[in-house]
Amino acid sequence: MKRTFVLAVSILFVFVSIGAIVSSADKSKTYYVCNCQDDCKCNFVANKPGKCNCGTNLAAMHVLAIEKGLGIFCRCGADCSCERSKSDPGKCGCGKSVKTVGLKGKYVCDCGPGCNCGTISEKPGKCHCGKDLKQVS
């Protein structure tokens, strides 16, 4: 019974954390996103620097838009203040290609109720804190 309660509270926290990441997305917030290739399917997003499950360093990006469960990120870096291009939605105002990341994460950090990692990934692996990512079903 206690284990079920702890699991339920953990899952609730995960959904609240995901909602906080999505709802608090603003253009001044720096996110750390896997940027291994243009066809990268890692969908790894965190609020702290580190490495993706594929081994690539996470790149500092800011969110341009959130659309239909996808985060659209500017690849210009943490200090960028670009807007999304009005003439080409696949680019930011500076002309660089945007990075699209699915935010409906299948794997999240399993630190527990006090978790501040904010790690979301499409693949199993390790969080930046060293804990295993847990599949949300």
Predicted regions and their residues:
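N-terminal export/membrane-targeting signals
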Residues: 1-25
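Intrinsically disordered, low-complexity terminal tails/loops enriched in metal-binding residues
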Residues: 20-137
